[in-house]
UniProtKB/Swiss-Prot annotation:
Its EC number is 7.2.1.1. PANTHER family: ELECTRON TRANSPORT COMPLEX PROTEIN RNFD, NA(+)-TRANSLOCATING NADH-QUINONE REDUCTASE SUBUNIT B. The keyword NAD applies. It catalyses: a ubiquinone + n Na(+)(in) + NADH + H(+) = a ubiquinol + n Na(+)(out) + NAD(+). NQR complex catalyzes the reduction of ubiquinone-1 to ubiquinol by two successive reactions, coupled with the transport of Na(+) ions from the cytoplasm to the periplasm. NqrA to NqrE are probably involved in the second step, the conversion of ubisemiquinone to ubiquinol. GO terms for cellular component: plasma membrane. The modification FMN phosphoryl threonine is found at residue 236. This is Na(+)-translocating NADH-quinone reductase subunit B. The gene is nqrB. The lineage of its organism: Bacteria, Pseudomonadati, Pseudomonadota, Gammaproteobacteria, Vibrionales.
Length: 414
């Protein structure tokens, strides 16, 4: 309560006419981190309840925690297994001493040995994820506050979600300066230029990742970025299938086959938050239950993916193994599940009419499979599919609204 009283006591200095008026956006950003603003709608018509933008964004933020924690554990576990597979004895000690992630883990009580426990794996994964997240949060937050100061309006909480989503869809080895550059593009070009929260037509986190993908492909794709172990190279399961079919799915470290359950649980290399479909489903159930995410969009994405993947299965191909990938493998490989649950359902860049949500979701699922199967240079397809569908979302809503108007005119006359 002392903090709240302090913030209330100094608030008048930041209001119009106060000596710190130009810093109101920064004050408001700090204050709303700790307390919900007391502003309510004063003019009709409106319905009041306990849900506001801040609470919605915080719930989405919490919903990605299962995927985030599993992603850190998996990133650490993959790195430790790879290091002990390649090095031993004094050679391993030299490698550990030369990488701050490794020696920091040991300094904090963790272990890089082959028998490292859950805590050590989580700790090592955290040394990769948390710096990326902190960089994204600080740099993106800087741009948010700067634009709010120039426009003289409050800071919205949408960036809490954008920052963590962006940090979860990049490799654990992404250089921090590229993380800063990617979120800068996402916030400034894909969001603030169009007016800020609620006015962007592209998903900012995906737009930032797309920028990095085309500007710095070596650091965000390929075989060397997914496992945080010095000197280790290993393709993702999706890339393995693209080059050799289901028989090519092997653990890059042990050589054992990768089962569907391995991919579903998340015991495979990949972007930090995308590997575990199970963890993503737990978070998705939370936001669907609270009606933050649209079940229609999720169902539409599944329908589009199943329909097109089944069509490719029927057609078949002797030269392209991706034609033969069944729908249940599309679900657990790559960024499909993460994109379906947390990116496609972004209420700002998605369709807002019920019928539009169905077509929007179907387009994403269909486009994702088409890009994965037909495009030989890019085995992943969810990012481009969602950004493509973002462009069509207003069209779907326009068609639905126009048809509703015509139907009502025909029903009730002039």
């Amino acid at each position: 309560m002392a903090l709240k009283k302090f913030l209330e006591d100094i608030e008048h200095h930041f209001e119009p006419g106060g000596k710190h008026e130009k810093w109101f956006a920064l004050y408001e950003a700090v204050a709303t981190v700790f307390y919900t603003p007391g502003l309510v709608t004063k003019k009709s018509s409106h319905v009041r309840d306990s849900v506001d933008l801040k609470r919605i964004m915080i719930m989405v933020w919490f919903a990605v925690f299962p995927a985030m924690f599993w992603g850190m554990y998996n990133a650490g576990g993959q790195a430790i297994a790879a290091l002990n597979h390649m090095y031993a004895g004094d050679q391993l000690a030299t490698v550990i001493a030369g990488n701050w992630h490794y020696w920091l883990t040991e300094m904090l009580g963790g272990s890089i040995s082959a028998d490292a426990g859950v805590g050590s794996k989580m700790l090592l994964g955290a040394t990769y994820f948390l710096p990326i997240y902190a960089t994204v949060f600080l740099v993106g937050g800087f741009w948010e506050v700067l634009f709010c100061m120039v426009r003289k309006h409050e800071v919205n909480e949408g960036f809490f979600v954008t920052s963590i989503l962006f940090a979860l869809i990049v490799p654990p080895t992404l250089p921090l300066w590229q993380a800063a550059l990617g979120i800068t593009f996402g916030v400034v070009v894909a969001k603030e230029i169009f007016g800020g929260t609620g006015r962007n037509f592209l998903n900012p986190a995906l737009a930032g990742r797309a920028f990095l993908f085309f500007a710095y492909p070596a650091q965000i794709s390929g075989d060397v970025v997914w496992t945080a172990a010095d000197g280790f190279s290993g393709a993702t399961a999706l890339s393995q299938w693209a080059h050799g079919g289901s028989g090519a799915l092997i653990n890059n470290i042990t050589g054992a086959p990768i089962t569907w359950m391995d991919a579903f649980i998340g015991n495979i290399p990949g972007s930090i938050g995308e590997v575990s479909t199970l963890a993503l489903m737990i978070g998705a159930a939370m936001i669907v239950y609270m009606r933050i995410a649209s079940w229609r969009i999720i169902a539409g994405v599944m329908i589009g993916m199943i329909a097109v993947s089944t069509l490719f299965n029927v057609v078949g191909s002797d030269t392209n193994p991706m034609f033969n990938m069944p729908w249940h493998w599309h679900l657990v490989l790559g960024g499909f599940a993460f994109g379906m649950f947390f990116m496609a359902t972004d209420p700002v860049s998605a369709s807002f009419t019920n019928k539009g949500k169905w077509w929007y979701g179907i387009l994403i699922g269909a486009m994702c499979v088409m890009i994965r199967v037909v495009n030989p240079a890019y085995p992943e397809g969810m990012m481009l599919a969602i950004l493509f569908a973002n462009l069509f979302a207003p069209l779907f809503d326009h068609v639905v609204i126009e048809k509703n108007i015509k139907r009502r005119l025909a029903r009730y006359g002039k």
